[in-house]
């Protein structure tokens, strides 16, 4: 793991998550967040190549999808974590 990967994992793990928190797994060029309480997938973050920007995905019918109807959601990591924590649809199975 390089330094930026370690920083992403540390920042995700340190976030004050609701519903018992998340576990972070690095996989296929991104980060998958799982509910620590249920083990269910919560979200997937994929670096967007600009500073700490990430593309955001949610679990929908056993696949990863972009939230909303307007294409990719790309946010700075801190804003993406806030969005995941505050939007209930990420936590349906968590």
Regions from the language model: what does each represent?
Residues 1-7, 58-94:
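Mixed-charge, Lys/Arg-enriched low-complexity segments
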Residues 1-37, 63:
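Negatively charged, low-complexity tracts enriched in Asp/Glu with abundant Ser/Thr
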Residues 15-17, 40, 46, 66, ...:
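Intrinsic-disorder/low-complexity coil detector
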Residues 26, 47, 88:
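Functionally constrained cores in energy, signaling, and assembly domains
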Residues 35-58:
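Short, conserved beta-strand/beta-arch hydrophobic-aromatic motifs that form part
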């Amino acid at each position: 793991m390089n330094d930026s990967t370690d920083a992403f994992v540390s920042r995700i793990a340190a976030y004050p998550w609701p519903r018992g928190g998340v576990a972070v797994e690095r996989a296929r060029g991104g980060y998958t967040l799982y509910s620590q309480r249920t083990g269910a997938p919560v979200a997937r973050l994929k670096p967007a190549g600009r500073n700490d920007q990430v593309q955001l995905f949610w679990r929908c019918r056993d696949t990863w999808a972009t939230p909303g109807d307007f294409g990719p959601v790309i946010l700075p990591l801190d804003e993406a974590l806030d969005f995941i924590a505050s939007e209930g649809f990420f936590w349906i199975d968590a």
